[in-house]
């Protein structure tokens, strides 16, 4: 303390006091935080030390800087920057801020969080009170009391920290969370700055948490679309879909304003939160989240039970229950050998969660009690009384007020209401009591009590005895709560089996439906409602899913489902005006059962839905009959034919439940394709009934499209049926009432409960009709402007994508709509950058973004002026598009860093999200890129050559065998796989087709080499493409191998890894009717033979010889009609003959093969003659037994010494020189070869030809006869003149290589040398 002057106190809280101070002997003003040690536990002191350690290493302009820290005897003192105030002061003084100021604060908050998250630090308590105002208008983030630096082995956390107003949904549900919880809090803060209140605020903690979990955010009209889109991304309830790093940095609301602090490399902290996790770490994170997540459906208890509990809780607030509880604790006993029930008391944060989770199911009851909308937040008391009770700071006595240590299951009266109430409270499905239900399940007395209560009270109920109902209802509620809250599926299923569930429940349901006397009882409705709640909770249990199966649970589940269908069928077969409540509850339970079936295996779900067309068809018939009776509340437009007008006074809950059940049967949930097999059969059945001329079903469903409640469900039913029936599409496309209803839905003229989803389904429905009919239904051409308006003006990404899908279909049918480039680019950018909420599978198994991508391609093609393409290529849309594609493919941020040495095992990559972009969408996106780069080729080069290029990472991934296997197995993947591969190859050809800087080209080649693209191209051709489409990939492979030695090795190693398959492919490709393909392959093989050692060339020998070693492939290639093919074949032979003794033997033993080789010497094409002379020359080198057979070639080669092509003359001269050593001197003399070679050596204009002739003469002079001829011709004198001419060249001119050989030959021809 001797370093500082303490000036004045500026703040106080439960942590201690904050003083303004000044460092002695300087003008530096600081803040001193005094934290008392007295009364602090060791854990609190450790947490304090952790905060200090975290703050000590932080250096960022938007994070408060800790200057110093020290301890006194009684306190810990932390010295930090002095700030001018809190952000909270602005809110209290001004209410809210202009959007430009909010934008500046947003950029600074994002900057601070980016810094923290890049260091793997979570703040976990983001709120206005922890944001300080610095000089100059900046902000600084402070208070790291809850911060947590995570180790590399920790991916998610479960401990709950933070302030309720700014807690994310996963926090209040106590699900595992990560850095995205901080981003949710930022969204809450920015919303509050702009609007004046937090996005979720209520006077009760119950209401608050309910709003956070369930309610959408209310958006005032004053917020700009860009800001709203930014907040929508941050305030997305699903953390997996929440706007996060790195996409957050590119959002237009803050792009370019975020400060990124780069630091020198420190210790390896693991993957920062600001980078996408590599696949292996993502798998680890998912496993941790799954292991730590609460299992099962929490909070699935009847609303009425919660309402009663809430009312009791409100009454108890005004009572002093301490003594009563204390007395109860004294009298309670625990039976020997039984596990005590868990304590109901909780820590302050646990209490808030308990209340919050209860509130998530109490939303409707609070609304009914007249609470209404959340009032504006009073600034003077932001936490509210309920929050204070939930988060007491200095009131430890509160913790034990609801504590009940144990419940004695033996000593209490069996029918005690208190006992069942305790059990109901104990089994409340809240996170802090996850162990309590498990304790009950492991208690044999509890299981026996439940079973006996159900048997005894059930028997009394069936006799109509009121006492039975009073005893069984509490047991029902405990069971419902227990089934909804327990996370241990093994223990829960074991308990159900021991307790006789669900058999007892379904038996009670069956007998109650058959008992007329029971149905007359006044309490019958309540009894059935609670019974159905338990059955519904049972069907929703996770042990009914195949991935969580326990012993024979799946068999029991299927049997229970079949029994329930029998009971439902009998109920639906009764008169429609009977048992309305029972009918409604059964239908709701059936809907839950369908949801459980959808998440199960293909076999189980198919058996279930198929039974609705066979043994359980009475259920489906009853549902369809319910839609055609007069109770259906259809809304018929004026002038339309009257169909089944409703009885207005009747309740609409039955038609709503029926339509919801039908939708559950027909609609395949996104991401669960296995259930479609069974649902498709049901849709076929319904479609056949809908297309019958005499059926009243179609008019009923069409009329219901304008009903507020039924509309969405019936849209889904009709849409699903049209997916399988083209005839139904034709009928609806010709039905005026159906089309009018759909048009009105698009135009917003029908009031429906969920306008966004209803409009989305309608847009896809109309797209499906156009797609299936391939023409426009009457009147749809007028819809273009309305759909275009939805596309450009909607801020809901799913609506923009659905509108784009329909616009693309309309455009293909010639409908024009006015879309300005800047408008559609902005709309596309918004849709691609906003979180995707996929609620329905688009037509044709398309992805969420497919329609948008197809529309963009269409617009670019139609409006494809160079200026437009330049605008698009430089727009934000282009960047967002690449990032979205990368996310769909689930690429890590640094894809290139994961590439290693050649690995043909190709470990599988994460499955792409086909629900977002399907194979068709990928093909459209790549075509869009091709259209852009064709006009702007330099853009392609810059995108591919920049370090860490997203485009390059995408293209490389699209060629990986693991991805191609996934693509082939995806719906319609086989159809679009060639398009994807060929588009990728075209894009990768750009660097080779354009004049590219050499250094940049080297970088591109290195990137492709490190990613094993050469190996992948060969595998693509062998396993995925038809022969007619391999020309381009082989051409690219050849170019890579000719340019880069490592790529050539990858090609050879890939052949060695699968020789039989690849040699078979190469054999077929060589003999194809595609000359360019054959030429490229021969060029690739020739380069391989020239560069690599003989040990790597056996596959080429096998390729040419064939399995029967007849060399039929080689014969066909030597006789090919195309000059280029013959030339490349001779060139390949020339390189092989340098190493292959087997090929030399084949030329000698295989009839006619040598003749084909020599035939090339007389070919009309000079390139072929050149290659043939090269091959014959190498055959003549150390020919051995082959030498005599080559004598027939001497006349032809002698004639070629006068060929106008210098290359041919050079090759022939070398070949003749080789033959002189094989005993063919007589033949050479007969053809006057020595004379011809001497003439070439002295007079050929090409230096390399002269050199070849001199080398040949040096070899031939060893033959006495040839030497004598040379001497007689005066070779020494002629060569001396040649040598003299070389010496007279200027000193600056380099001496030709032939000069050395000339001198050597003169020396050899001297008479003394001949001695």
From Swiss-Prot:
Does Chloroplast count among this protein's keywords?
A: no
Q: What is its EC number?
A: 2.7.11.1
Quote the catalytic residue positions. 125
Q: Which InterPro entries match?
A: ARM-like, ARM-type_fold, Kinase-like_dom_sf, Prot_kinase_dom, Protein_kinase_ATP_BS, Ser/Thr_kinase_AS
Q: Where is the Protein kinase domain?
A: 4-254
- Which residue intervals are annotated with compositional bias (Basic and acidic residues) in the record? 379-397
Q: Which Gene Ontology cellular component annotation is one that this UniProt entry carries?
A: cell projection
**Keyword tags:** ATP-binding, Cell projection, Cilium biogenesis/degradation, Cytoplasm, Cytoskeleton, Developmental protein, Kinase, Magnesium, Metal-binding, Nucleotide-binding, Nucleus, Serine/threonine-protein kinase, Transferase
Substrates-to-products reaction catalysed: L-seryl-[protein] + ATP = O-phospho-L-seryl-[protein] + ADP + H(+); L-threonyl-[protein] + ATP = O-phospho-L-threonyl-[protein] + ADP + H(+)
Q: Does the keyword Glycosyltransferase apply?
A: no
Question: To which protein family does this belong?
Answer: Belongs to the protein kinase superfamily. Ser/Thr protein kinase family.
- Tell me the protein's name: Serine/threonine-protein kinase 36
* Species this chain originates from: Pongo abelii (Sumatran orangutan)
